[in-house]
Amino acid sequence: MDLSKWPLINWLAFLATIVINYFASGENAAVSDRIDIYFKPAGYAFSIWGVIYIALAVWLVLQLKKGSVANRQANRMKAGFLVSCILNGLWLLTFTNEWFIASLVVMVAFLATLAWLYYIAFRTSTSWLDRFPFSIYIGWVSVATIVNVFVVMNRERVTTLLGLDELAWTSLMLMVGVVLALVFMWWHRDFIYPLVFVWAYIAIFARIDNATLYVVLVSALILLTLGYVGLIIWKKPRAFLHHSRKTVE
């Protein structure tokens, strides 16, 4: 068992994050409910945090085994995981206090930190399982970052931007999300990341009441599904289970 600095710090940071999220979840939901934007998944979609935290907990257990893939990942991440936990809690602080511009700044930093953690996880192992916690984590925070942008626009009363209103920007960003998900899938041989977007888009569809967005969402989901299946057929399923990129021992 590896009880060195980073594995232990990671556990402490994770437990603190769970506690903070538990006590802040009610206020976070209340603030979110008061903000009426198109690009927002239905409440049930946020249950994905349970999957994320369970996956991270499993990874944290595995990182305690000296020499394991998770252990090598943790030691290469150094303070990265700790920083992600701090930013997670800091985002809750800014959002629940309705400091929305600050919350967006924190969210972007959070996403950048997760991108770094994902890169290390990707370079340490070829198996999709060894990066699953970070695939689903960065996927959901990618969606949350887009949501956060629309929250800021709403609270700052930005009704149009570059000549486009909220409906037009929502339609555009739904399609941008499709491209992002498929490019990420292709580049990293990651079949988990785009599934998070499918989950989010279905949840957005479940709560909206706008004919235009119905059409855009259905189109986005069809394109995402076709692209997803097409990439798997093109690259072969095995390429997504074990990528061929060079890893660091």
Regions found by a protein language model. Give the residues of each.
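Alpha-helical transmembrane segments and their membrane-interface exit regions
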Residues: 108-119, 201-203, 223-231
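Membrane-interface helix caps and helix-loop-helix hairpins in membrane proteins
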Residues: 91-104, 122-128, 156-163, 183-187, ...
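N-terminal membrane topogenic signal
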Residues: 1-11, 49
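Short aromatic-rich membrane-water interface segments that cap or initiate transmembrane helices
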Residues: 35-48, 134, 158-172, 208
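Central hydrophobic cores of alpha-helical transmembrane segments
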Residues: 192-203
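Membrane-interface capping segments at transmembrane-helix boundaries
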Residues: 65-66, 120-123, 230-246
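Membrane-interfacial loop-to-transmembrane alpha-helix junctions, especially the N-terminal start
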Residues: 70-81, 189-194
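Alpha-helical transmembrane segments of multi-pass membrane proteins
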Residues: 14-29
